[in-house]
């Protein structure tokens, strides 16, 4: 609770972070990202032009740029000790779900359970992404999917557990997109090329037209 109270003070004047969202103090939130009401962000980072829908929870997750995350998603679920006497976090975490603090320092390494969400990722409503999963750039996670393993760049996955349905583009186009890394280009460059982002079924020729200077 202390982390959330400090987070409230830290992000109080971020106009795109809802007053009714809970964000821990140690989270890193871009001023150009948006967190909607009743969402929870715990020890996570969110980069520019990404948004988190209402009632979505992020735990130990890093979210890239231009990501669209719908409502009621669970990303990076809390982990529990399976090989100890007890699975309760009261024995291993200073701040935990019980609201009681029995120890002065965490005894488990949370960093190994981080979820990595790439850039330009779309995550549908009610999707769940388990801990220690990496979602590649440009991927799409279908509504209600439960993602238990890594998702490749530009893959479309759905189902329980989530499986690859298809890829958004041809291998040639995907490789070119990964070379360009358009999400790292300056805003003025993207605005100059906005017509290309409004076109369906892009080709290598279209991508080669992107003005990067």
Predicted regions and their residues:
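Membrane-proximal basic amphipathic "stem/tether" segments
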Residues: 1-30
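Flexible, glycine/small-residue-enriched loop-and-beta-strand segment within the central core
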Residues: 34, 41-133
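Beta-rich strand-turn-strand
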Residues: 127-139, 145-148
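Glycine-centered loop/turn positions within well-structured domains
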Residues: 83, 149, 153-155, 163
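Conserved catalytic-core motifs of eukaryotic protein kinase domains, centered on the activation segment
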Residues: 79-81, 151, 167-169
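Catalytic-loop signature of eukaryotic-like protein kinases
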Residues: 120, 138, 155
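C-terminal segments of enzyme domains that contribute to small-molecule binding surfaces
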Residues: 88-129, 161-213
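Conserved G/P- and acidic residue-centered "switch" motifs that form tight phosphate/ATP-binding loops
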Residues: 141, 159
